[in-house]
Amino acid sequence: MELGLEKLARKLGHRFGDFSLLTEALTHRSVSVGHNNERLEFLGDSILNCIISDELYQRFPQASEGQLTRLRATLVKGETLAEMAMELDICDYLRLGVGELKSGGSRRPSILADALEAIVAAIYIDGGMDTCRSLVVAWFTKRLDTISLDKIKKDPKTQLQEYLQAHKLDLPEYTIVSVNGEAHQQFFSVNCVIEALEITTLGEGISRRKAEQEAAEKAIQELPKKP
């Protein structure tokens, strides 16, 4: 067991039988291409979605599939997971390469969110689904207790699409303008073009989806200005 991980384990609320799982979950690709947290992150993403989906299904019996999807998206989006990782002090235990450390990687939302998902998988493998579910629900309790159907809204791309359909206009076209950065840490720039309204907006983000959402949100802000 590496020094300090026992303290993190207590913070997480789980006594690991195999601390190498926790070490792997904290290891960024910049440290080791072949032995890092990417596989655990892949598994943890699915487990987290399953647990939160089930919890929302039980808590909101009258919610539609679309409403449940938006509730889940709010809870498991990268920004939320990064906030939780900070609350759990995961940032203090990340294993990063020299370059990532110098560039502030321990506070980068995408790295924090990925590490939290990897830790979820590590706990699942080490302690089983029941243990993992109990801990995840405990971590999310405050957010689960405060989220409501009144507080959720459709994402910008959906809002824009519905507006255009209601006005019998062609849907927007999203085009990648540029992609910068390493393969595991890319930054996207995307144009959203609505030809009928002569609107063109630029969105940026750490994924194509995030860039498209930002571009759509900017386009929505321009809609009232157009006849």
How does the language model describe each region?
Residues 1-227:
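Double-stranded RNA-binding/processing signature
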